[in-house]
């Protein structure tokens, strides 16, 4: 399956955008494509001044795998809303906390998806999230 049509990219989400989590509503209208895994390690970022709740950060280090849910977004406005949540500015990646990258996905109905990769300070990373699963690790 294609990662991206003219206006409908596939995203793989691993944290607060997952089903049952606090920001999942931003995916209303997106087509669910199933769960899978991406390579990397999921880290906890504790509550901070700019975000009043803890959240996960994906580091693409290839050392383990992270549980993701894949969705085909409804179009550019929905993707822009996700970018805002993730503090990603496609026109200024250097100033972005996360960057959106296309990566391989294992075990899902898609082979590749766009995922938000953390590029902020590693000093903000608290601890690895067990099993690379935000939901099973108690996140929300």
Stretches with model-predicted labels:
Residues 2-140:
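Glycine-aromatic micro-motifs
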């Amino acid at each position: 399956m294609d990662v991206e049509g003219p206006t409908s990219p596939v995203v793989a989400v691993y944290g607060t955008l997952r089903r049952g989590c606090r920001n999942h509503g931003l995916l209303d209208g997106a087509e669910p494509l199933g769960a899978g895994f991406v390579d990397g390690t999921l880290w906890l970022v504790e509550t901070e001044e700019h975000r009043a709740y803890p959240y996960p950060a994906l580091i693409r280090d290839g050392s383990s795998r992270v549980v993701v849910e894949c969705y085909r977004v409804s179009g550019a406005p929905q993707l822009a809303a996700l970018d805002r949540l993730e503090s990603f500015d496609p026109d200024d990646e250097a100033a972005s906390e996360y960057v959106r990258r296309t990566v391989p996905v294992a075990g899902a109905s898609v082979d590749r998806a766009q995922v938000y990769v953390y590029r902020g300070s590693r000093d903000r990373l608290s601890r690895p999230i067990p099993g690379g699963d935000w939901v099973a690790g108690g996140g929300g």
